Swiss-Prot record:
Cofactor: Mg(2+); Zn(2+)
Function: DNA-dependent RNA polymerase catalyzes the transcription of DNA into RNA using the four ribonucleoside triphosphates as substrates.
Organism: Ostreococcus tauri
Record-linked SMART domains: RPOLA_N
The protein's name: DNA-directed RNA polymerase subunit beta'
InterPro entries for the chain: DNA-dir_RpoC_beta_prime, RNA_pol_asu, RNA_pol_N, RNA_pol_Rpb1_1, RNA_pol_Rpb1_3, RNA_pol_Rpb1_3_sf, RNA_pol_Rpb1_clamp_domain, RNApol_RpoC1
Length: 740
């Protein structure tokens, strides 16, 4: 079954009854919760008529009643499907359905315990209560429908003002701090339930200050949520929709005319005073347009979905199924219960208390203060179930933490929709804090061994069954729990070459989840190369990342070929590189490749590198390979920034191709000094092997050219480049990371 969408909307009282009430095979109607009890403290079984009643919500045992005397029976009729026609087969299949009875002892219908997840109950209220979503939210739906202020709606619901039962009248005088005596109500009613221009100057025994100011307000029966229900019932949605559409159209036309007249006055250069008055009129028209459009929007929504506004006032309060608000016994013997059970109990207790007051007194002598107080408590109990966090004084646990209401269970990041329906926790995944791993390669990540053992547990179990002689899965799991060395060795083999996916929320683009090769490490933090952090928008100040294991071969191939971090250098949005060296890396490169500074108090005179190189030709800072340079640096024979000569057998690129000095010794070996390297060659084939030394002067290359042309017949030459141990070390690092 595919679910396209989930919609929350109003439910009628008959719909709530259909959810909760059902008829037993005996003809008895069950569904209404009459007691606030949950379970029996001796038998630990649900109380009858309580919040976990088995008669209302179904039995807790599969196919058994509460006492165990009655079980669910099935009538099995043998059917020969080959000879019967389709109609006879359907008729006999209907006869094979389960026969369900009701236990004569406990009255519980033996059913499957799964029905306790969807069977609902209800609480019938003597006086209706308002739904909190429709008078405490912004915009206020009840205020918009009744064309009243939000404060008036709130005061009416919580019995701070009076709404008369006579249609078309409104009270203009009652407010907090005034009490109306019962014997004075009849003579006062024409004044406070009639028109506003009725004279109040008549002398009467009740028209005095001492009568109006003694104590609190006096209300009549039709007040609170019942008063709003009466007003909402009288709303004609079709007429209101037609009337508001006409008013909205006329108001918009007035606004256009006002704007047109304003432009004319600007042309005539009227005074600023007249323009200010016009702006005030336009502002008032804008407010009216906003009010009309908002009210019209609510009315159209109700009419389009076939809903009635009086359904916002609840006279039958629905109760969730018991398995969605469970009560669980812990190992210590105590019970842990959902917060909703405590909130439902408060509502039932206050409902029972109010009904008891109605039975103790006659209607003529009801103590109004107590009745009004109980109705306020009943409204607050209903509000705390719907949205406890929005109350001024929310219902709290003994540890002074507020209860979680229905709204808090549904809304927010950890609510039912975002946490469990839209985004679910998946298998083969984990989460931990990320730390920097500078020794890792770009396509690698450090994975804790404990996390890897849990993530790759099925692969490890399969390897144990195939290679280690373990006979069954239970024995393999016992080996995993003991954490033997064989398990860690198999884990290393399983993880080798198996990519994992790292994801950091929020995943705003496709680079928010990339593939890496795991490297098993001790500890509990995930190590990540610092260069891949910009793609995740991550840093190492406590960020967490999720690990996912691709299971199938197709998923592993996709992770390795498409999602590997080294295959995602460029941003798909801008085309710019997402992997760039950080500032500390650039400073490290500079430190490795720079020359040794001259230590002097005076301003140093910078010598050309070639001059310093010529002075070093006769020194001992000459090396034949990289290993000898690194060994000399590790043994502190040379400094990191010291200038050395290194034998070089590869391609040389230089900006100046003319030699600076050519030296030929008596044996015929030629030493040619260039700007940044030295070339040594074998003996010449000429008759004279005398020493020849020519040094280039400024802008004079004739003598050099003569000698240089004589060197064309040299044997194989050896090149020595001018460098530093730091540059050799930097070259080795690049070579290891690029070509290995």
């Amino acid at each position: 079954m595919s679910i396209e969408y989930v919609q929350l909307q109003l439910a009628s009282p008959s719909e709530i009854k259909r959810w909760s009430q059902r008829i037993l095979p005996t003809g008895e109607v069950v569904g209404e919760i009459s007691k606030a009890d949950t379970i029996n403290y001796r038998t630990f079984k649900p109380e009858r008529g309580g919040l976990f009643c088995e008669r209302i919500f179904g039995s807790t045992s599969n196919g058994e009643c509460s006492c165990g005397k009655t079980k669910r029976r099935k009538l099995i009729v043998p059917v020969n499907f080959n000879r019967l026609t389709l109609q006879k087969r359907n008729a006999e299949l209907e006869a094979t359905q389960a026969i369900i009875e009701v236990c004569p002892s406990c009255g519980v219908e033996p059913t499957n315990s799964k029905v306790r997840r969807y069977r609902m109950g209800c609480i019938s209220l003597k006086k209706p209560v308002a739904h909190m979503w429709y008078f405490r939210n912004s915009p206020n739906v009840l205020a918009a429908l009744l064309n009243m202020r939000s404060q008036e709606i709130d005061e009416t619901i919580h019995f701070q003002t009076y709404t008369p039962s006579k249609y078309g009248t409104q009270n203009y005088c009652l407010h907090g701090g005034v009490q109306w005596y019962v014997n004075h109500w009849e003579p006062m009613h024409p004044y406070f339930a009639g028109d506003i221009d009725v004279s109040m100057d008549k002398a009467a025994s009740w028209n005095s200050k001492s009568t109006f100011m003694p104590s609190q307000i006096k209300t009549i029966e039709n007040c609170g949520g019942e008063a709003l229900q009466e007003l909402l019932t009288r709303l004609d949605l079709v007429f209101l929709q037609r009337m508001l559409s006409r008013k909205l159209k006329n108001t918009i036309e007035k606004k256009k005319l006002a704007a047109k007249s304003l432009r004319k006055r600007h042309k005539r250069r009227k005074t600023a005073k007249l323009l200010g008055r016009t702006d005030q009129k336009n502002y008032g028209i804008t407010i009216k347009v906003r009010e009309y459009s908002r009210r019209l929007e609510f009315i159209r929504s109700l009419a389009r979905k076939g809903l009635r506004p009086e359904w916002m006032i609840l006279s039958i309060f629905p109760v969730l199924p018991p398995d969605l608000r469970p009560m669980i016994q812990m190992s210590s013997g105590r019970f842990a219960t959902s917060d909703l059970n405590d909130l439902y109990r408060r509502l039932i207790y206050r409902k029972i208390r109010f009904e008891k007051f109605l039975t103790l007194f006659d209607e003529e002598f009801l103590p109004d203060l107590l009745i009004r107080h109980d109705l306020c408590l009943l409204q607050e109990a209903a509000d705390s179930i719907i949205d406890n966090g929005r109350l001024d004084k929310p219902a709290q646990r003994p540890n002074r933490k507020p209860f979680k209401s229905l709204t808090s269970i549904i809304e927010g990041k950890h609510g039912r929709f975002r946490q469990n329906l839209l985004g679910k926790r998946v298998d083969y995944s984990g989460r931990s804090v990320i730390v920097v791993g500078p020794k890792l390669r770009l396509h690698q990540c450090g994975l804790p061994r404990e996390m890897a053992l849990e993530l790759f547990q099925p692969f490890v179990i399969r390897a144990l069954l195939e290679e280690s002689g373990v006979k069954n899965i239970r024995a393999a799991k016992n080996l995993l729990q003991r954490r033997s060395q064989m398990v860690w060795d198999i884990l290393d083999t399983v993880v080798l070459g198996h990519p994992v996916l790292l994801n950091r929320a929020p995943t705003l683009h496709r680079l928010g989840i990339q593939a890496f090769e795991p490297i098993l490490l001790s500890g509990r933090a995930i190590q990540l190369h610092p260069l891949v952090c910009p793609a995740f928008n991550a840093d190492f100040d406590g960020d967490q990342m999720a690990v996912h294991v691709p299971l199938g071969l197709e998923a592993q191939a996709e992770a390795r070929l498409l999602m590997l971090a080294t295959h995602n250098w460029l941003s798909p949005a801008t085309g710019e590189p997402s992997i760039l060296p950080s500032q500390d890396m650039i400073l490290g490169f500079y430190y490795l490749t720079t020359l040794k500074p001259t230590v002097s108090l005076k301003r140093p005179v910078e010598q050309p590198m070639a001059v310093r190189g010529r002075n070093l030709i006769q020194s001992n800072s000459i090396f034949n390979n990289f290993e000898s340079v690194l060994h000399a640096y590790e043994t502190s024979k040379v400094d990191l920034h010291e200038i050395i000569w290194l034998r070089w057998s590869s391609y040389i690129q230089t900006t100046n191709s003319e030699p600076l000095q050519i030296t030929v010794n008596k044996t015929g070996h030629v030493t040619t000094v260039y700007d940044s390297f030295v070339m040594q060659s074998g003996a010449t084939n000429g008759p004279d092997n005398s020493m020849l030394s020519v040094q280039m002067k400024s802008r004079d290359t004739s003598s050099i050219s003569k000698v240089y042309n004589c060197l064309t017949s040299l044997n194989a030459a050896a090149f020595y480049i001018l460098t530093t141990p730091g540059r050799v070390l930097f070259n080795n690092l690049i070579y290891e990371n690029l070509f290995l």
